[in-house]
Amino acid sequence: MQGFVEDFLKPRLVDIQQISATHAKITLEPLERGFGHTLGNALRRILLSSISGCAVTEVEIDGILHEYMHKEGVKEDILDILLNLKGLSIKLFGKDEVTLYLKKSGIGPVLAKDINHDNSTEIINNKHIICNLTCSDASIDIRMKVTRGRGYITAKSRKENYDNEHIIGKLFLDVTYSPIERIMYTVESARVEQRTDLDKLIIEMETNGTIDPEDAIRKAATILAQQLEAFVDLRGVREPEIKEEKPEFEPVLLRPVDDLELTVRSANCLKAESIHYIGDLVQKTEVELLKTPNLGKKSLTEIKDVLASRGLSLGMKLDNWPPKSLLED
């Protein structure tokens, strides 16, 4: 029995089929028999319940006191407008909560691109229809709160945070934060040399555009691995006390640039310049970054704002960078 665990086959990522920017099919093999369903179901549940995202949670519409009223000059009922607001795909950079405003008048559709926002917010589906105005003197004025979270939160639980006096005119939404819109997995037979009783795991998923499917599966796998760490040593052996040493660098500098949740364009530009860690990024100056192909002033402003929200800035000097721990990785 000794070495039995080491005898297990280790799967490898054999194919990533990028069907579209939001739709991908990922294949892993070979897996020991039965492990296809074991891992596939676990990853599926984590992807649906534990990947964080952003959503509209509270809405105020001028002249509307509750969701069963009707807005003059607007084709949709208030309930339909709320459902359409739930369909917005939103990313927040450096913030966990923002308030967005939408004002529109005149005949025609009211689209997601009509929402006013700053660089801390990106709306992916700009052509998403929120409602339709039916006459020239029709108008709509919406105030919406967007928050970051994970899982499912009911409107009732949000109402409990307000007293009756401050709840009038606020419309609360049931929220599913997960950016995963569809996830399914299949298990097929795989073969390694003479063994034909192995599994191939195929995961197919679609996101709302706020996260890359490959990044989503990586985050889900990381969450699963972290939750299982406690079972690695069931004896619960007490680790020897180690004197705390002041770290050479702030922990935030050792984190990957992906943790900044930059737009895809900005992130790709940094990766092309081999800027993988936040410590790499903060040592760059504005002039150096502007020399990066395809990285313009808008991306530079985004990077500066995200760093500032973490108490960092460009042009920092870090002695003895990179640390040995990163070089060993």
UniProtKB/Swiss-Prot annotation:
Its EC number is 2.7.7.6. Disulfide bonds: none annotated. Residues 1-235 are annotated as: Alpha N-terminal domain (alpha-NTD). It catalyses: RNA(n) + a ribonucleoside 5'-triphosphate = RNA(n+1) + diphosphate. It is an enzyme of class 2 (transferase). GO terms for molecular function: DNA binding; DNA-directed RNA polymerase activity; protein dimerization activity. Coiled coil: none annotated. Keywords: DNA-directed RNA polymerase, Nucleotidyltransferase, Transcription, Transferase. Residues 249-329 are annotated as: Alpha C-terminal domain (alpha-CTD). The N-terminal domain is essential for RNAP assembly and basal transcription, whereas the C-terminal domain is involved in interaction with transcriptional regulators and with upstream promoter elements. Belongs to the RNA polymerase alpha chain family. This is DNA-directed RNA polymerase subunit alpha. It comes from Buchnera aphidicola subsp. Cinara cedri (strain Cc). The gene is rpoA.
